[in-house]
């Protein structure tokens, strides 16, 4: 507290959709009640929702634990983002309506810009939907390392985990050098036109 830092407790989840597809979502606790709901969701995902060792959430569990939680959409990896990128605007509106019904004034469309494929398409579609639906937005960054000069080390760790080498021309490149912990000033500059 003396350092001017406020702790925000939250968790990233994979959400199992009814059609067996997965999306990502982040929950942030607003209070002790929200924290209890968050821990209940984490426990249930591990105890009842594991698929191949991966804990997954189900919508019906979320409905029962929505009080005092804020939700970040998951960006292009969330259900709304996946629909937007696939050109399914009606499905995106429907997904957004579900979230805003269960989390009124507590659901935020994430805006991200890391120079990766599809980010600009998602960004423009998400802003348009947010304006249309009067949904708040939040600028986030998919942080994987602290500083830009740590990108190569991160890539080496990914290659080790995948059993590949850095010079393998066929290896997938899922990350960019822009996925570092940006300062507030950098984020404001990046999204100044929004």
Cite the ranges covered by each PLM segment:
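Phosphodiester-processing cores and adjacent nucleic acid-binding clamps
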Residues: 1-194
């Amino acid at each position: 507290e003396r350092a001017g830092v406020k702790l925000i407790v939250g968790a990233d989840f994979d959400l199992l959709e009814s059609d067996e597809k997965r999306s990502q979502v982040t929950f942030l606790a607003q209070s002790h009640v929200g924290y209890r709901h968050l821990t209940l969701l984490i426990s249930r995902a591990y105890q009842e929702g594991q698929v191949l060792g991966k804990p997954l959430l189900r919508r019906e569990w979320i409905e029962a634990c929505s009080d005092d939680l804020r939700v970040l959409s998951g960006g292009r990896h969330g259900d709304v983002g996946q629909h937007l990128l696939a050109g399914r605007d009606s499905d995106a509106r429907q997904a957004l309506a579900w979230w805003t019904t269960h989390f009124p004034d507590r659901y935020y469309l994430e805006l991200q810009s890391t120079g990766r494929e599809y980010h600009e398409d998602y960004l423009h579609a998400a802003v348009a939907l947010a304006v249309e639906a009067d949904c708040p937005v939040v600028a986030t960054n998919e942080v994987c390392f602290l500083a830009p000069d740590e990108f190569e080390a991160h890539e080496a760790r990914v290659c080790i985990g995948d059993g590949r080498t850095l010079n393998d021309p066929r290896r997938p490149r899922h990350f960019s050098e822009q996925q570092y912990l940006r300062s507030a000033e950098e984020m404001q500059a990046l999204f100044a036109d929004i």
